[in-house]
Amino acid sequence: MEARAQSGNGSQPLLQTPRDGGRQRGEPDPRDALTQQVHVLSLDQIRAIRNTNEYTEGPTVVPRPGLKPAPRPSTQHKHERLHGLPEHRQPPRLQHSQVHSSARAPLSRSISTVSSGSRSSTRTSTSSSSSEQRLLGSSFSSGPVADGIIRVQPKSELKPGELKPLSKEDLGLHAYRCEDCGKCKCKECTYPRPLPSDWICDKQCLCSAQNVIDYGTCVCCVKGLFYHCSNDDEDNCADNPCSCSQSHCCTRWSAMGVMSLFLPCLWCYLPAKGCLKLCQGCYDRVNRPGCRCKNSNTVCCKVPTVPPRNFEKPT
């Protein structure tokens, strides 16, 4: 019985050895240390590392030749050295004394990563600033050349072959003159010049002297009434209600006399129409360049042919 008890007591350490794995009871579990190492950095820690940004979007200022930029501290190389150190696995017995140092290991890795990114951005900003300095330097150095910039398109000299004489149609357009006044008798010159007019309200209403008189003397109401009362589409009595040469002259004048009792402004239509004719004649006399004679003889004036000039440079 004692032998069995001893053998039973002696088998307990054999069963405990694989469970302990050569680790003492006071030592921490290495898996806990690994879980402590792998953790995510917070935003406060990242901001504490990089509180300023070296890259700027604003324009760079050209440094003066007498001043030299101050050298920057070489903190990036220190972080790169920390990043370049080989990682060795430590025995589990020494991990409980370096828990705090292992917790800072990801922090150093992030520092090296940020430093490498900032180094690339610093190179980019340095290259861009150097290119801008070259451009600015070239613009400053080319100051006297700016006075010789050509701002007007140069004109080439005319060659004799490029000078074309006027055609016969252009010469004979104003060749027919009046025998009495000596002015041109072509269609363009003898056409009567009307008073100026213009479209208003997005080209919906024509503003002219005739329309002003029609709306001012209420003749537009008479024209509308005659338009709706006429049966013939070809009847133009609505356009000229006071005409004596068209049909239904007595009927129209009687209707206008009755309407003038309710619209007294109709009495001003005939005087306003006479003033319009007078203004039209004065405007035509001033602006018409052609002949205004009714019965006159036409004389054809020949335009003398002028030989072309020689634009060659004298030798």
Curated annotation (Swiss-Prot):
GO terms for molecular function: protein kinase binding; protein serine/threonine kinase activator activity; protein serine/threonine kinase inhibitor activity; ubiquitin-protein transferase inhibitor activity. The record marks 144-145 as: Cleavage. Residues 20-32 have a biased composition (Basic and acidic residues). Changing residue 252 to D: Abolishes interaction with CAV1. It comes from the Eukaryota. Changing residue 144 to L: Inhibits cleavage by the prolyl endopeptidase FAP. Antagonist of fibroblast growth factor (FGF) pathways via inhibition of FGF-mediated phosphorylation of ERK1/2. Thereby acts as an antagonist of FGF-induced retinal lens fiber differentiation, may inhibit limb bud outgrowth and may negatively modulate respiratory organogenesis. Inhibits TGFB-induced epithelial-to-mesenchymal transition in retinal lens epithelial cells. Inhibits CBL/C-CBL-mediated EGFR ubiquitination. This is Protein sprouty homolog 2. Forms heterodimers with SPRY1. Forms a tripartite complex containing GAB1, METTL13 and SPRY2. Within the complex interacts with METTL13. Interacts with RAF1. Interacts (via C-terminus) with TESK1 (via C-terminus); the interaction disrupts SPRY2 interaction with GRB2, potentially via disruption of SPRY2 serine dephosphorylation. Interacts with PPP2R1A/PP2A-A and PPP2CA/PP2A-C; the interaction with PPP2CA/PP2A-C is inhibited by interaction with TESK1, possibly by vesicular sequestration of SPRY2. It is found in: Cytoplasm, Cytoskeleton; Cell projection, Ruffle membrane. Residues 178-315 are annotated as: Required for interaction with TESK1. Belongs to the sprouty family. Residues 1-39, 51-140 are annotated as: Disordered. The Cys-rich domain is responsible for the localization of the protein to the membrane ruffles. Keywords: Cell membrane, Cell projection, Cytoplasm, Cytoskeleton, Developmental protein, Disease variant, Membrane, Microtubule. Residues 118-315 are annotated as: Required for interaction with CAV1. Residues 1-15 have a biased composition (Polar residues). InterPro entries: Sprouty, Sprouty_domain. One of its GO terms (cellular component) is plasma membrane. Residues 108-140 have a biased composition (Low complexity). It is linked to IgA nephropathy 3: A form of IgA nephropathy, a common primary glomerulonephritis characterized by glomerular sclerosis, interstitial fibrosis, and mesangial glomerular deposits of immunoglobulin A and immunoglobulin G visible on renal biopsies. IgA nephropathy is associated with renal insufficiency that can progress to end-stage renal disease. Proteinuria and hematuria are characteristic clinical presentations. Residues 177-291 form the SPR domain.
